[in-house]
Amino acid sequence: VPSRAVIAVTNDAANAIETVGVTYTLGESEAQIATATFSKPLTPGATGIAQFAFTPEAIGANQLLSLKISEVNGQPYVNENAYPKTATITVIEEGSGFDRNVVIEEKTGTWCKFCPRGIVGMEKIKADVTDGTLIPIAVHTSDPMSTTSYSGIEYAIDGAPSAMVNRNFVSIGQIDPNYNDLKLAYEIARKDPAIAEITINSVEEDASATKFDISTRFAIDESSARYRIALVAVEDNVGPYPQTNYYSGTNVDLDGWEKLPNPASTIFNDVARAIKSYQGLSSSIPSTIEAGTTYSYTKGFIDNTGIKNRANARYVAMIINSLTGRIENATSIPSPSSVALDNIGAAENEGPVRYFNLQGQPVENPTRGQLLIRTCGSKSSKIVF
């Protein structure tokens, strides 16, 4: 199956790089040599993306790809201190994969003075991507919205604000959650098909837990599969809480945060209330899977007591690859308790329609793309104007 590999290369030399020769092995196959090209010459000190074509010998999951650079601009390259880079890949037949949804897990906190940058980035990319393929989760640490069940993120990424996309640290890595980086990472993640799909057939809420009926389906056969289902409860319109705001009084254009005080009273979205579990639930997916077969899982449940208002909640189900740690695919549905209020009109509830930003400030003239709270009488809803 003809395939392509994308690699990141940093130029530590004094001259530009146009091509690199890559010596690689896949699984137990013999070493092969390929030429990786850049879209434009890589200048000294810069890091760029190159890709090369290769043909795997077999279709299957979790194959080890090992490579090293052996040529630069057609000339032999030897670096005694360089170790081969490795990645675990899955090879599927062309056209046999599934549409890939993108999970962005952002590490944030009200104590973090730069985190307004992530708040703006997440809201803007949500305004761009409205087809359900984006699943944003804001994981708060050391503030009133934090949950110990999501402490795994502390070991996965450093500092705040920061984010990971499908937990893919090979082709994407840890990123800053500004809008431009989030959008690029989303586009990269969406390009490749997923090896599996996951569906939440139904959820049932009671006073302390939410129970799930979930199905999964794979595009490959695997006899020693190591996949697990993870469940997340997320809530919007949380707060207000005081958000530390470095941008207050600066000349940085950050969607109005530069005009807000420090700290700024803020309503938060996409707040992770609980996850079960960060590594995924054991025995939630069989160890032997067959392509095209649907597997049901009805034993999953999650603590929902952290949710303050179920009308603002939604639930996420993810397939975790236990070997690589990556999210192979995910899906999200609103809480059954949520009420669709997006089409509120004055006739439905007496009173004028008014708009507020996430800090609770009135917005007289909304502009296209803004995420706002819309009120009408006693009713309110979160909308993208």
Show where each model-derived region lies:
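C-terminal tail/sorting-segment detector
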Residues: 373-385
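Short acidic/proline- and small/hydrophobic-mixed sequence motifs that coincide with surface turns
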Residues: 14-19, 224-226, 363
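Intrinsically disordered, low-complexity Pro/Gly/Ser/Thr-rich segments with frequent PxxP/GP/PP motifs
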Residues: 30-59
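Asparagine-centered strand-capping/turn motif at beta-strand->loop junctions
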Residues: 8-14, 218-220
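Residue-level detector of functionally pivotal "anchor" positions at catalytic/ligand-binding pockets or at interdomain
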Residues: 1, 88-102, 332-362
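Local sequence-structure signature of Cys/Sec-based thiol-disulfide redox active-site neighborhoods
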Residues: 94-132
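Terminal connector regions
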Residues: 58-94, 314-328
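Short, conserved sequence motifs used for protein processing/export or organelle targeting and
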Residues: 34-43, 74, 132-338
